[in-house]
C-alpha cells in the first residue's frame, strides 16, 4: 500500500509548519545542518524507494498462519476441524511450486551466514517429501472416515495409516537435527515436531473409535508427553545457541541478531508455547491460549543497496554499539500493557529551503496494563522548538505502520531520520479502521518505505488486513546518535486480548504477566522461551499481583483454578476474588536450587474446590506462602476450568438445603437451635443467594423464606 500524498498530509497537519530559519546546532539536538555537496543528487536515493525486506512476507506468514490456526483449535476439536487443520498445514508447508521447506532453510542460512551441508539438506528435503505424501494420504483417509464413521473399512484404513505415519515421524525427526546443522534446520524441526505432536493427539481423540486398545492409546499418549518435553527443550536450546552466536559489538551485528530473534520467535517459539495445550487429558474441551511475548521489527533507517555508499546506511553512520541499542529499544520484563498515546518531538535537518527534513527526534509514550494505572516513558530529545505531535491510540489496535526512512546527505556526512509514519489502526470490537500519521514536511531528501506487514504479515490473505492482522503495536524504541535517529517498533500477538475474558464453556489460560499490578517482592522476569512470554517470580512469601478478569454469563457456572508454576520449594498457593479467599492448597517443589528453567521444571496443577464469580468484572489474586526466603517460585499462567453447570448447581442446592435444615433442631423443625448465632444465619443466607436462578429459582425462594423465619426467631429470642 502506497503512502498518501505528502502535500495532503502537510495541509492536514496543524504542526506542518517548517522552520526554515532555525539556527540551533546539532549539539542541542534541535537542528542538524551539514555542508552542501556537488554530487548530492548522484548519491541520494530515489524518492519513496522501497527497502527490499530481508525476508519475504510469505515466509513468515507461513509460521504466523499455522500458529494462528492452531490457536483456534486447542483442546479437543471436532473431527472436521482436525481434518481442516491438516488440510491447511499441507497447503502451507507442501504447496505447489518451490518447497516451503527450502525457503525456511535459505532464510535461516542468510541470517546466520551458514550454509547447510549438501548431504544434510538433501536428506532433510527427501524425508520431508515422504512425510508430506504420507500425511496427505492419512488426511484423505481421515476425511473419508469422518464422513462415514460407521464404515468398517474406512475405520480400518485410517487406523492403519495413522500407525504407519506416526512411526514415520519417529524415524524421520532425527534428519532435522543433524549434528552441526541444528540451528539452520530449526524452523523445519519445529514444524515437523509440531505435526508429530498434533498427530499423537489424534490417538487420544479418535483411538477408541478406531478400535485401538486402551493400552495402545496410553502408549501414544505417553509418547506425546515425552516428545512434548524433548521437542521443547531441543527448540529452546538451539534457539539460544543461534542467538548467542550472533551477538556482536556494533549496530550491524545487532540487525542480524534482532532478525533472528524475531523470525525464530514467529517460526519456532510460538509453536513451542502451544505444545502443552495439545494434551487432551489436561485440556479435554475448547481451550483459549495467549501469546504475550514481544517481537521487534527492523529499525526504520535507510539501507543503501550499493556498497560504494555503505556509509549512508544507518548502522554504518556512527550508530550506537550493540549493547547500547539493546538497552535503548528492548524493553525490560514488564506487565503486558497497551499503547494509548504517543507524543512526538521533532528535529530539523536542513541545508536549504529546498533540502531539509523534519524528523522524529524523541517521544513520550503512555501505556496501560489491563485495568491498571497509566505508565509514561520517554526516549530521545523532548526539548525542541518544533511543536510536538500527539497521536491517540486508546482502545485501538495499531496493526500496521508504514514508515519513511529518510536520508539527508551532504558531502561525506549523511543524516538518517524518520520524516513520516502512518499508523493504521482498528477498534478491536468494531468494524472501524482508520489511520493517524506523523508528518511535518521534507524536501530534497532520499526516502525508503518500510512496511511492517513485510515482517509481520496478516494471518491470512483472504480477508482485509484490518480484519486478519496478527500483531498490534505495543511500544516504540529509538536508536539515537549524533546523525542517526532510527525507530524500532515492538509488537504483541493479537491473541493477547485486552479483556481477560473467562468463558463458561472453555478453558481460559491467562498469563500472569497480564496482571494490572505487581505486589511488593514480586518481579517480572524473562520467560524461558517455551512459555510464550515473560513470567512472574517471588523469592519470599506474599502475593504476586492482581488480574482484572471479565466473566461471561451464566454466573451459575463454577470454575476450578489451575496454576502452571515452577518452584525450588514446597509451598502453599492462596487465591482470592475481590479480596475474598477461595482456594488454598499445598504444592510440591518442581526443581532444585540453581537449576535452569526447562520444560520439566514446570507443572500444571490445580485446586479441587470449585467456585463461581458473582460480578461481571472481578479482581483475581494469587500468592505463595509457607516457604523460606531465598527460594524461587515462578508462575507462568492461571487457568480457569469450567465445571459442569448442572452437576454443580445440583450439588450447591443440596448443600444449601442441608445448611438451612441444620439451623433447626431435629426434634422440632420449627425450633431454632440454641447455639445458632447471627453470623451463622448470614452465612446460610449468602449460600442460598449464590444458588442458580436458572435451575433452582422456586427452591431458592422457598429456602429464603425459611432463612427469614430463622432470622425472625433469632431476633425475638434476643429481645
Curated annotation (Swiss-Prot):
Keyword field: Sporulation, Toxin, Virulence
GO biological process: sporulation resulting in formation of a cellular spore; symbiont-mediated killing of host cell
SUPFAM superfamilies the UniProt entry points to: delta-Endotoxin (insectocide), middle domain, delta-Endotoxin (insectocide), N-terminal domain, Galactose-binding domain-like
MF terms in GO: signaling receptor binding; toxin activity
Disulphide-bonded residues: none
Similarity section: Belongs to the delta endotoxin family.
Organism (species): Bacillus thuringiensis subsp. entomocidus
Function: Promotes colloidosmotic lysis by binding to the midgut epithelial cells of certain coleopteran and lepidopteran species. Active on Plutella xylostella but not on Bombyx mori.
Other remarks in the entry: Toxic segment of the protein is located in the N-terminus.
Protein name: Pesticidal crystal protein Cry1Ib
InterPro entries xrefs: Galactose-bd-like_sf, Pest_crys, Pest_crys_dom-III, Pest_crys_dom_I, Pest_crys_N_sf, Pest_cryst_cen_dom_sf, Pest_cryst_dom_II
Amino acid at each position: 500500500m502506497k503512502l498518501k500524498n505528502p502535500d495532503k498530509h502537510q495541509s492536514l497537519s496543524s504542526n506542518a509548519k517548517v522552520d526554515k530559519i532555525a539556527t540551533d546546532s546539532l549539539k542541542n539536538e534541535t537542528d542538524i545542518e551539514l555542508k552542501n555537496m556537488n554530487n548530492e543528487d548522484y548519491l541520494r536515493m530515489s524518492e519513496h524507494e522501497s527497502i527490499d525486506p530481508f525476508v519475504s512476507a510469505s515466509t513468515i506468514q507461513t509460521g504466523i498462519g499455522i500458529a494462528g490456526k492452531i490457536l483456534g483449535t486447542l483442546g479437543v476439536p471436532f473431527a472436521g476441524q482436525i481434518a481442516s487443520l491438516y488440510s491447511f498445514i499441507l497447503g502451507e508447508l507442501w504447496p505447489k511450486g518451490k518447497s516451503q521447506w527450502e525457503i525456511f532453510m535459505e532464510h535461516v542460512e542468510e541470517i546466520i551466514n551458514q550454509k547447510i551441508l549438501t548431504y544434510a539438506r538433501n536428506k532433510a528435503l527427501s524425508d520431508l517429501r515422504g512425510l508430506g505424501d504420507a500425511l496427505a494420504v492419512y488426511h484423505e483417509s481421515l476425511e473419508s472416515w469422518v464422513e462415514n464413521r460407521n464404515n468398517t473399512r474406512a475405520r480400518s484404513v485410517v487406523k492403519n495409516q495413522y500407525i504407519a505415519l506416526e512411526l514415520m515421524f519417529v524415524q524421520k525427526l532425527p534428519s532435522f537435527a543433524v549434528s552441526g546443522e541444528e540451528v539452520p534446520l530449526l524452523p523445519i524441526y519445529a514444524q515437523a515436531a509440531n505435526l508429530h505432536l498434533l498427530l499423537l493427539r489424534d490417538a487420544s481423540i479418535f483411538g477408541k473409535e478406531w478400535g485401538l486398545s486402551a493400552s495402545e492409546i496410553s502408549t501414544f499418549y505417553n509418547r506425546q508427553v515425552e516428545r512434548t518435553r524433548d521437542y521443547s527443550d531441543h527448540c529452546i536450546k538451539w534457539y539460544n545457541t543461534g542467538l548467542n552466536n550472533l551477538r556482536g559489538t556494533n549496530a550491524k551485528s545487532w540487525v542480524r541478531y534482532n532478525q533472528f530473534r524475531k523470525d525464530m520467535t514467529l517460526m519456532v517459539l510460538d509453536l513451542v508455547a502451544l505444545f502443552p495445550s495439545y494434551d487432551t487429558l489436561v485440556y479435554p474441551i475448547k481451550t483459549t491460549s495467549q501469546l504475550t511475548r514481544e517481537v521487534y521489527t527492523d529499525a526504520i533507517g535507510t539501507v543503501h543497496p550499493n556498497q560504494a555508499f555503505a556509509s549512508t546506511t544507518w548502522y554504518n553512520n556512527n550508530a550506537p554499539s550493540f549493547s547500547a541499542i539493546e538497552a535503548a529499544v528492548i524493553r525490560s520484563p514488564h506487565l503486558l500493557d497497551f499503547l494509548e498515546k504517543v507524543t512526538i518531538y521533532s528535529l530539523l535537518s536542513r541545508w536549504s529551503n529546498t533540502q531539509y527534513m523534519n524528523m522524529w527526534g524523541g517521544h513520550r509514550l503512555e501505556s496501560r496494563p489491563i485495568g491498571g494505572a497509566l505508565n509514561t516513558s520517554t526516549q530521545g530529545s523532548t526539548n525542541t522548538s518544533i511543536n510536538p505531535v500527539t497521536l491517540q491510540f486508546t482502545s485501538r489496535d495499531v496493526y500496521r505502520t508504514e514508515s519513511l526512512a529518510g536520508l539527508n546527505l551532504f558531502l561525506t556526512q549523511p543524516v538518517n531520520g524518520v520524516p513520516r509514519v502512518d499508523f493504521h489502526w482498528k477498534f478491536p470490537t468494531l468494524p472501524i479502521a482508520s489511520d493517524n500519521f506523523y508528518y511535518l514536511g521534507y524536501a530534497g531528501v532520499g526516502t525508503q518505505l518500510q512496511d511492517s506487514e513485510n515482517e509481520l504479515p496478516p494471518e491470512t490473505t483472504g480477508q482485509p488486513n484490518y480484519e486478519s492482522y496478527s500483531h498490534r503495536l505495543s511500544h516504540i524504541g529509538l536508536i539515537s546518535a549524533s546523525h542517526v535517529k532510527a525507530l524500532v517498533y515492538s509488537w504483541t500477538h493479537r491473541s493477547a486480548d485486552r479483556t481477560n475474558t473467562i468463558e463458561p464453556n472453555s478453558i481460559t489460560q491467562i498469563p500472569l504477566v497480564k496482571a494490572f499490578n505487581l505486589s511488593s517482592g514480586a518481579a517480572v522476569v524473562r520467560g524461558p522461551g517455551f512459555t510464550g512470554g515473560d513470567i512472574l517470580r517471588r523469592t519470599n512469601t506474599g502475593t504476586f499481583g492482581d488480574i482484572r478478569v471479565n466473566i461471561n454469563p451464566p454466573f451459575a457456572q463454577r470454575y476450578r483454578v489451575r496454576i502452571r508454576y515452577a518452584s525450588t520449594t514446597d509451598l502453599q498457593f492462596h487465591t482470592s476474588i475481590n479480596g475474598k479467599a477461595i482456594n488454598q492448597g499445598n504444592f510440591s517443589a518442581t526443581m532444585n536450587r540453581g537449576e535452569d528453567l526447562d520444560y520439566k521444571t514446570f507443572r500444571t496443577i490445580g485446586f479441587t474446590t470449585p467456585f463461581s464469580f458473582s460480578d461481571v468484572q472481578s479482581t483475581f489474586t494469587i500468592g505463595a506462602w509457607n516457604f523460606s526466603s531465598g527460594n524461587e517460585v515462578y508462575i507462568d499462567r492461571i487457568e480457569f476450568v469450567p465445571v459442569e453447570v448442572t452437576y454443580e448447581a445440583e450439588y450447591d442446592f443440596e448443600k444449601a438445603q442441608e445448611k438451612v435444615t441444620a439451623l433447626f433442631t431435629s426434634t422440632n423443625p420449627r425450633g431454632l437451635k440454641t447455639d445458632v448465632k447471627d453470623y451463622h444465619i448470614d452465612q446460610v443466607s449468602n449460600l442460598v443467594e449464590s444458588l442458580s436462578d436458572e435451575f433452582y429459582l422456586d427452591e431458592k425462594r422457598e429456602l429464603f423464606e425459611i432463612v427469614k423465619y430463622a432470622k425472625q426467631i433469632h431476633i425475638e429470642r434476643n429481645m
